[in-house]
Swiss-Prot record:
This protein's name: Uncharacterized protein MJ0745
Lineage: Archaea, Methanobacteriati, Methanobacteriota, Methanomada group, Methanococci
Family from the record: Belongs to the M.jannaschii MJ0150/MJ0739/MJ0745/MJ1460/MJ1642 family.
Disulfide bonds: none
Domain of life: Archaea
């Protein structure tokens, strides 16, 4: 494996995401990388005139990518799913339209029902996968978020698997939702 250090001072976010998506990339100096990421994003957003209630998407993507790399090193991708699951439960949507609205309002993509039996949700224009290229699905957080949200909607335990991912070159991200029996 090759070691590579990313310095954001000389790179734009698109190049940062491209480097991050390389399969052999290892974070060798986490604190410096995190500081460079935060400083880049502070500079980018300091002139913003609107107050943002949520974390800027670029910052969220960078945080999740860093978490993905560290979690993958530990062979534990389930952790991002668990974090998303708890967040989805925290949202506590009462119906599908609440979840769809959440995705739209937070620029996560356009959530649609692709099929009903089995239940497959489609996220078009997934903002997280934009500019990324991976060999495997990467939306563990989103899968967990959908699982937690759908448990609130259906009042039954569910499991969600990402079956297609834009980061793999698919047209959208697809999530299969199954009730646990």
């Amino acid at each position: 494996m090759k070691n590579m250090r990313v310095e954001l001072k000389t790179k734009d976010m698109k190049e940062f995401y491209k480097i991050f998506s390389e399969s052999e990339f290892i974070i060798t100096d986490d604190s410096k990388l995190i500081n460079e990421t935060v400083n880049y994003l502070k500079k980018k957003y300091k002139n913003s005139t609107t107050k943002k209630k949520l974390i800027p998407l670029d910052l969220f993507k960078a945080i999740v990518l860093i978490m993905m790399k560290k979690i993958k090193e530990l062979d534990s991708e389930i952790t991002l799913y668990d974090i998303g699951y708890e967040f989805g439960k925290h949202l506590n949507p009462k119906r599908y339209s609440d979840l769809k609205k959440f995705f739209k309002e937070n620029n996560l993509g356009t959530l649609k029902v692709d099929s009903r039996k089995p239940l497959v949700l489609k996220v078009e224009n997934c903002s997280f996968c934009e500019d990324l290229s991976f060999e495997e699905p990467i939306c563990y957080f989103d899968a967990g978020l959908i699982a937690g949200a759908y448990e609130c909607i259906l009042k039954k335990p569910v499991v969600v698997d990402e079956i297609k991912c834009m980061a793999r070159g698919d047209d959208a991200c697809y999530f299969k939702v199954e009730v646990v029996k």
